Curated annotation (Swiss-Prot):
Record PTM text: Carboxylation is probably crucial for Mg(2+) binding and, consequently, for the gamma-phosphate positioning of ATP.
Keywords for the protein's UniProt record, in alphabetical order: ATP-binding, Cell cycle, Cell division, Cell shape, Cell wall biogenesis/degradation, Cytoplasm, Ligase, Magnesium, Nucleotide-binding, Peptidoglycan synthesis
Family per similarity comment: Belongs to the MurCDEF family. MurE subfamily.
Organism: Rickettsia conorii (strain ATCC VR-613 / Malish 7)
Pathway: Cell wall biogenesis; peptidoglycan biosynthesis
Cofactor dependency: Mg(2+)
Protein name per its UniProtKB record: UDP-N-acetylmuramoyl-L-alanyl-D-glutamate--2,6-diaminopimelate ligase
């Protein structure tokens, strides 16, 4: 098969591989793969019309079409083709999993590499970010963990352009569906764990075991797992990894790297910690105790790749907050955060409540996504009622659900607390800003970095941060 594939590549001057007819380019080979929701065999003619030079399929019905080649196992043929066509990867790989914090840790690691003078890239929810050189990648699928072909294509492109270090997010869906296949990493990180994605995993135990596949299936034999010691299930996780002979180290208030004191304000925080019997202290413009853990997980990741610990610590003052992750909008008291789980919302509200002035108020604008875990909606309403002074319930990405019913499920958890319901997200944000008084804080939660809103089949332009900026110009809140 290898010899035949190599011959086909040469004979047809193949330029790339594709499993999505929408993204086929001239002189690609299209692999017609049957997925969970769609079958590539239904799109063979589309792929050919877009310039595919060949189609590989394991469906004999399609071999009557010109340029279609039959194989017994199309997946196996694809994986073999990937090894031939996209063989390269950056030399050191780090993967990050967790309910919340993946994007932050991935960005902090890549930023720190760059500050240490290294070429690095990150892959995840926010897309592909490249540090230390020009942006090389376009047309990235919108998945936290890419399909295997997309991942290998990007990794090969990065390596070809001199990127030495790659850090990426590994979602529970991606791990459960084995999207990473045989990819091995030097370091694997676990940032946090709480309820999410039960629409897919059904139980919290299944969800946790899916996360742990990162360490069991993808960590190199001499690799290290870096764990947040404040995960509620940390003892189970440590026992599980120990039973699989996986080396690990913990970070947090009870960690091997122990966070001993945090002093936070709207402008950032001072972090104190101990490691290897030494005390350390540094300042960061990034707020949130959970972000302190994320920063230090990033520190240990890079240290165990082979960089001097003190050099890594010295670079932290220049690491910036990630778009849509406790992002303070300009010099206002308005924050945009991706918090879309009960745990993330509670942490974000708690952090802001702790740093606000005593007599000021904390407001929150949020909704919940449609066609996603319904069990978390009332919980998020309950958390908002407990932590915020003013609650504004609005729409997130309703997708194909009735947004009014989604809002009702959130409101069912609010119980006796007062709230305002405004379906239109921009109007809800505007209302929240208009009602701010001196020193009040507003959190706009749920969408973070996203620059769209999904309503039915439509993906409409919408960016929480830009809406905030627009409303601030009109409303002139006191910062």
């Amino acid at each position: 098969m290898s010899h035949n594939l190599k011959q086909l590549f040469q004979q047809h001057n193949v330029k790339g591989l594709s499993i999505n007819s929408k993204t086929v380019k001239d002189k690609d080979i299209f692999f017609a793969i049957k997925g969970q929701n769609t079958d590539g065999n239904d799109f063979i003619k589309d792929a050919l019309s877009k310039g595919a030079v060949l189609v590989i399929t394991d469906n004999k019905k399609n071999i009557v079409i010109d340029k279609v080649i039959y194989v017994k196992d199309v997946q196996a043929a694809l994986y073999e083709a990937i090894e031939i066509f996209y063989p390269k990867k950056p030399k050191d790989l780090i993967a990050v999993t967790g309910t919340n914090g993946k994007s932050s840790v991935v960005s902090y690691i890549a930023q720190t590499y760059s500050l240490l003078g290294k070429k690095a890239a990150s892959i995840g929810t926010i897309g592909v970010e490249i540090f230390g050189c020009v942006n090389l990648i376009n047309d990235v699928p919108e998945l936290t963990t890419l399909d295997y072909l997309s991942f290998r294509k990007i990794a090969h492109n990065l390596a070809e352009n001199g990127i030495e270090y790659l850090v990426f997010e590994a979602s529970s869906h991606g791990l459960d569906q084995a999207r990473l296949r045989e990819i091995k990493v030097n370091i694997a990180c676990f940032t946090s764990f709480s309820q999410d994605h039960l629409d897919y995993h059904h139980t919290k135990e299944n969800y946790l075991l899916a996360k742990l596949k990162l360490f069991i299936n993808h960590l190199l034999p001499n690799g290290i797992a870096i764990l947040n010691s404040d995960i509620e299930e940390i003892e189970f996780v440590k026992d599980y990894l120990h039973n699989h002979n996986i080396k690990f180290i913990t970070v947090g208030t009870k960690g091997d790297l122990e966070i001993t004191r945090l002093n936070g304000s709207l402008k950032g925080q001072n972090i104190n910690f101990t490691f290897n019997n030494r005390e350390y202290n540094f300042n960061t413009p990034i707020i949130g105790s959970f972000q302190a853990s994320n920063l230090l997980i990033a520190v240990l990741s890079i240290h165990y790749i082979g960089f001097a610990f003190d050099d890594v610590i010295d670079s932290l003052v220049e690491v910036k907050a990630v778009k849509g992750r406790m992002e303070r909008i300009d010099n206002t008291n308005i924050f945009v955060d991706y918090a879309h789980t009960p745990d993330a919302l509670e942490k974000a509200l708690t952090e802001l409540k702790n740093i606000k002035l005593r007599d000021s108020k904390l407001s929150v604008v949020f909704g919940c996504g449609g066609n996603r875990d319904k069990a978390k909606r009332s919980l998020m309403g309950q958390i908002a009622a407990k932590r915020a002074d003013t609650i504004i319930i609005t729409d997130d990405n309703p997708r194909h659900e009735d947004p009014k019913l989604i809002r009702a499920e959130i409101i069912s958890g609010i119980e006796k607390a007062d709230y305002t319901e405004i379906a239109n997200r921009e109007e809800a944000i505007k209302y929240g800003i208009n009602n701010l008084k001196q020193d009040d804080i507003l959190l706009v939660a749920g969408k973070g970095h996203e620059n769209y809103q999904i309503i039915g089949d439509k993906k409409l332009p919408f960016d929480d941060a830009e809406v905030v900026r627009k409303c601030v110009k009109v409303c002139h809140p006191v910062a």
